[in-house]
């Protein structure tokens, strides 16, 4: 996590508690929408990293000899694309394979955003609730589009109260508030899950770093105390960085992508089941007519 995102405050005025963009929730007096935050710089760095990655892949692919083995980097990128394409086809259908670039880019962007905190002075974009909420909004819009595409009018009927008459369900024009809340739940769940995990790692590392500084603060020689704190923190914290930045960061990016797959697949599967039920009812009706005739 970025040291700039871990700011502390002592009684003499030195910052010791995380505050930038985390606990400042006053939207009127303290809100400065035009003031860039640390995460904005992190987003720019991630963009440069991914752009460089794709340019290197494109150049290596153009220079590659089809009669010879490709480089490890080219093979890794191709394997990643094939995995994303197969996963897209398996979960949301062959007809939606055109969404493969989106899911692949989403995975690379999230993993890069989480790992960028390993670079000193750069805050991970995912430590900003605005950033994760924007990604969650894209997932939510995809849910709505998939629902309308496969369920048609049934998607809108799911937001109203249904009544059952003689075993058949009929939709009313009365809105069901619980259905609306349930539809918006994935938006908040997927956004807060990612943000909470990254922010939690940031806070734990902040506490761990400053524990060693406080442990040696009783020494009369302040420069020596700070030096010893930095040495012990530098020796013991790499394992925590590997877990919170690399393991958790990569895992949370993968989880976000798979949840997006599942939410979209749910809308598609409901629509396909309704279509199959309608086709089965029509087939039964035709069979009944043939028997009567």
Swiss-Prot record:
Its main location: membrane. InterPro entries: ATP_syn_F0_a_bact/chloroplast, ATP_synth_F0_asu, ATP_synth_F0_asu_AS, F0_ATP_A_sf. GO terms for cellular component: plasma membrane; proton-transporting ATP synthase complex. Coiled coil: none annotated. GO terms for molecular function: proton-transporting ATP synthase activity, rotational mechanism. Pfam families: ATP-synt_A. Keywords: ATP synthesis, Cell membrane, CF(0), Hydrogen ion transport, Ion transport, Membrane, Transmembrane, Transmembrane helix, Transport. The chain crosses the membrane at residues 39-59, 73-93, 102-122, 128-148, 172-192, 198-218, 224-244, 245-265. It is found in: Cell membrane. The keyword NAD does not apply. GO terms for biological process: proton motive force-driven plasma membrane ATP synthesis. It is a multi-pass membrane protein. CDD domains: ATP-synt_Fo_a_6. Key component of the proton channel; it plays a direct role in the translocation of protons across the membrane. HAMAP family: ATP_synth_a_bact (MF_01393). F-type ATPases have 2 components, CF(1) - the catalytic core - and CF(0) - the membrane proton channel. CF(1) has five subunits: alpha(3), beta(3), gamma(1), delta(1), epsilon(1). CF(0) has three main subunits: a(1), b(2) and c(9-12). The alpha and beta chains form an alternating ring which encloses part of the gamma chain. CF(1) is attached to CF(0) by a central stalk formed by the gamma and epsilon chains, while a peripheral stalk is formed by the delta and b chains. Belongs to the ATPase A chain family. This is ATP synthase subunit a. It comes from Mycoplasma pneumoniae (strain ATCC 29342 / M129 / Subtype 1) (Mycoplasmoides pneumoniae).
């Amino acid at each position: 996590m970025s040291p700039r995102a871990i700011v502390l405050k002592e009684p003499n005025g030195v910052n010791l508690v995380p505050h930038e963009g985390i606990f400042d929730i006053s939207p009127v007096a303290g809100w400065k929408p035009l003031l860039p935050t640390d995460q904005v710089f992190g987003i720019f760095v991630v963009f440069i990293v991914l752009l460089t990655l794709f340019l290197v892949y494109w150049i290596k692919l153009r220079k590659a000899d089809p009669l010879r083995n490709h480089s490890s980097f080219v093979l890794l990128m191709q394997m990643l694309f094939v995995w994303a394409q197969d996963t897209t086809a398996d979960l949301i259908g062959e007809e939606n394979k055109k969404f493969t670039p989106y899911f692949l880019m989403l995975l690379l962007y999230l993993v890069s955003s989480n790992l960028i905190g390993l670079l000193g002075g750069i805050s991970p974009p995912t430590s900003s609730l605005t950033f994760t909420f924007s990604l969650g909004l894209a997932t939510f819009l995809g849910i709505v589009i998939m629902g309308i595409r496969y369920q048609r009018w049934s998607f809108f009927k799911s937001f109203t109260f249904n009544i059952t008459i003689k075993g058949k369900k009929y939709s009313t024009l009365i809105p069901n508030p619980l259905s609306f809340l349930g539809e918006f739940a994935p938006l908040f769940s997927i956004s807060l899950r990612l943000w909470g995990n990254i922010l939690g790692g940031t806070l734990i590392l902040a506490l761990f770093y400053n524990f060693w500084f406080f442990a040696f603060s009783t020494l009369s020689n302040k420069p020596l105390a700070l030096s010893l704190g930095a040495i012990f923190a530098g020796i013991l914290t790499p394992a925590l960085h590997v877990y919170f930045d690399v393991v958790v960061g990569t895992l949370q990016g993968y989880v976000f992508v798979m949840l997006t797959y599942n939410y979209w697949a749910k809308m598609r599967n409901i629509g396909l089941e309704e279509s199959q039920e309608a086709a089965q009812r029509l087939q039964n009706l035709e069979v009944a007519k043939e028997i009567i005739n």
